Amino acid sequence: MINTLDRYKDVYDIKNMSLDELNLLSRELRNFIIESVSQNGGHLASNLGVVELTLSLYNVFDFSYDKLIWDVGHQCYVHKILTGRRSGFQNLRKINGLSGFPKRCESKFDHFETGHSSTSISSALGMARARDLKGENYNVVAVIGDGALTGGMALEALNDVGDNKTKLTIILNDNQMSIGKNVGGLSTYLSSLRIDPNYNKFKRDVEGIIKKIPNIGKGVAKNLERVKDGVKQVLVPGMLFENMGIKYFGPIDGHNIKQLSKVMDKAKNMKEPVIIHVVTTKGKGYKFAEQNPDKFHGIGSFDYMTGCSKKSKGVTYSKAFGKAMVSIASKDKRVVAITAAMKDGTGLNEFSNKFKNRIFDVGIAEQHAVTMAAGMATAGLRPVFSVYSTFLQRAYDQVLHDVCIQNLPVVFAIDRAGLVGEDGETHQGVFDMSYLSHMPNMTIMAPKCVEELEFMLNWALSQESPIAIRYPKGESRLNLKPIKNFQKGKWEVLEDKGKISIIATGRMVEKAFNVKETLKERNIDIGLINATFVKPIDKEMLNKIIDEEKTIITLEDNVILGGFGNSVLNYVRDTNSNIKVVNLGFKDEFIPHGKVDDLFKMYGLDEEAILKEVMKLM
């Protein structure tokens, strides 16, 4: 028997399906997504939560001309399947395969590319205003989660939307179940009255009857209005949006296609901004994801039947950072941790359990996090802001203006520095060296191995200025002794031989070390330096290399432009030396999705390519 998903041809089929067929399609879509992600990895829980929501959107709107923007974008799998990309899921997030996020080059139905949170309302408003200025007629819909709504950019956009009354539909996908049972039931009841077209007529009729009561009628009606407004302010969460000038519907059951379609159809025909508050269950339909949605947010391949993923044997940098924070904080009460909704991802769970009053999760608010850290530093604390490289760039101005200008002792623990792999352009952490290097007072460090990270963090917290420590996703297989005592701007010599010296940073030291060992087996010697400090560079060591007239190869997992290699090259040029400097890093382009090892090979930064580069310079 052919199932509904196999019979499905294009988005117009959805409008011709019965409610039973749509519900059956929902179940089949979930099964397909679970099976696909179990094989290739990806974002599971968020996608399972928006199946009915996505079907309802396509049931009501026509996104061949209407516009749909997914905030963050990791919940777009159903959308991609419905728009003809089901076959691409066998290569999901692989090089040249289907992206895990909206991509305009993939489909005419991907109207805007996303990856970071809180951007959808702004981009949707831009499209809506362009529509109005050009005299066109289409709907614009933004889907944003309750977590992303904590981002300042989303709130700025809401303020603008409500002020100018531009026609726009915002779907607030609330998957945190933040509405309690009693309040939730009452809120749903009140919402159903507000959605019902007879509600306003009923309200007018009651007010009319009361006003006809001799002597006291008008006064009672006014007081009734005040009471009604007071009750709504207390009990109806949507009053926040109503007061901003945005019509509110909800909360709605995000897994009820009939109810969702009804409300969306009403919003579609309104001439003002509308927000539809839907409540969904993250991981819906797969018990392991429902029970542990955080684990199944972004996950590698796993066993479909048990939900168990392949366990990593080694210690990741994130885990090492978390353990180091616990160890250091137990000895120094000034140390506090800050995270922007990434407590689990950055390894701070144990810290959170042991020091509940010394960890601050500010939500998706990196700008606020950095300036709050600056305030803490001025008051005598030692704040550590743990953040992914790609998200720190959202707080560039705060790092420069609020931390560096005042030369404050804030430590930036930059996780996922360098390649992160399958999440692609929006998440690769290959810019932090460049945008931090030109900030006065900033020191940048990179451990060569997991063990070195704790000693580096200890040293950073003893300094009186801003320090950034960058480290990659995953583990280190480098079996070398860590540096335990650091001297600012001093590098570590791992091998001082030959006429070529590789100066490598962070995880790239492991690749350089393996290349050195391969050459050693061929009786070829080269030098190897662990550039523990990306900034300041070790000028004394560089002067020694210049005096010995060695060729320098710099190796970094950052874009070359403005990066570590550029700093070395500029210094050598300033000395008027003629020695050759070769910078190996990423080109001036955005790096696509794919496995980390495949991407290193693609950009000529795998061990084989580095070895060839060394041999060319012999």
Swiss-Prot record:
Q: What Enzyme Commission number(s) does the record list for this chain?
A: 2.2.1.7
Tell me which SUPFAM superfamilies the record gives.
Thiamin diphosphate-binding fold (THDP-binding) (SSF52518), TK C-terminal domain-like (SSF52922)
Q: Name one GO cellular component term.
A: cytosol
The answer, when asked if Transferase is one of the entry's keywords, is: yes
Q: Is Transmembrane included in the keywords of this UniProt record?
A: no
Q: Which Gene3D superfamilies does the annotation name?
A: 3.40.50.920, 3.40.50.970
Regions crossing the membrane: none
What NCBIfam families does the database record attribute to this sequence? dxs (TIGR00204), PRK05444.2-2 (NF003933)
Q: Share what the entry says about its subunit structure, partners included.
A: Homodimer.
The protein's role, per its UniProt record: Catalyzes the acyloin condensation reaction between C atoms 2 and 3 of pyruvate and glyceraldehyde 3-phosphate to yield 1-deoxy-D-xylulose-5-phosphate (DXP).
Protein's recorded name: 1-deoxy-D-xylulose-5-phosphate synthase
| Species whose genome carries this gene | Clostridium tetani (strain Massachusetts / E88)
Q: Gene encoding it?
A: dxs
